[in-house]
Design a protein with these regions (language model features):
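Residues within mature, well-folded domains
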Residues: 1-167
Length: 167
């Protein structure tokens, strides 16, 4: 009887499935058909940001701390390809938020217990003329959070500040 919310923003069913899809890409060999076969397609994958060459330059341009030779060879190929270079930034997640515990204590605001579980995944894929030249992934494979709010006065807890503020 307590509220639940499910947030799905990925075609992948799990973090490992998303990781496997990105790890399966072979730089300098995998092409658009491989990406589509693995379920990686900006037109089908929600929350995919298509990056222009200028976006990629802003992310990887060498700075005082990072020299050109420190960059991955695939990134260098992409930067040198100029307008032939495109990138996809993929963000996916499956998050379940549920209030658990005693219905009466929750309803009367004495105690609320919220559990958040799931995963978050992000990946960056760079392509030159439709061929993958670089891929990287990261994220949170397992989210498990518990939040407990206790109000000793229950529904009366918020009345005190309301009375003080009206004077």
């Amino acid at each position: 009887m307590l509220p639940r919310a499910l947030n799905e923003s990925s075609v992948f069913q799990s973090f490992d499935e998303a990781r496997y899809a990105v790890d399966s890409l072979v730089p300098m060999k995998s092409d658009l058909s491989t990406l589509t076969r693995l379920g990686i397609d900006p037109s089908q994958q929600p929350n995919t940001l298509i990056l222009t060459h200028a976006d990629i330059v802003r992310r990887f341009v060498p700075s005082a701390l990072l020299k050109r030779e420190d960059l991955d060879p695939g990134v260098l190929v992409c930067l040198e390809a100029r307008e032939a270079c495109r990138g996809w930034e993929i963000t996916g997640a499956r998050i379940l938020k549920a209030r658990t515990g005693n219905f009466f204590a929750d309803f009367t605001n004495f105690s609320r217990r919220s559990e958040t579980t799931g995963w978050r995944f992000n990946a960056l894929i760079l392509l030159v003329n439709g061929v993958v030249v670089y891929r990287a992934w990261g994220g949170q494979p397992r989210i498990n959070e518990l939040e407990v709010n206790t109000n000793p006065l229950g529904p009366l807890q918020d009345i005190g500040p309301a009375i003080v503020n009206t004077r």
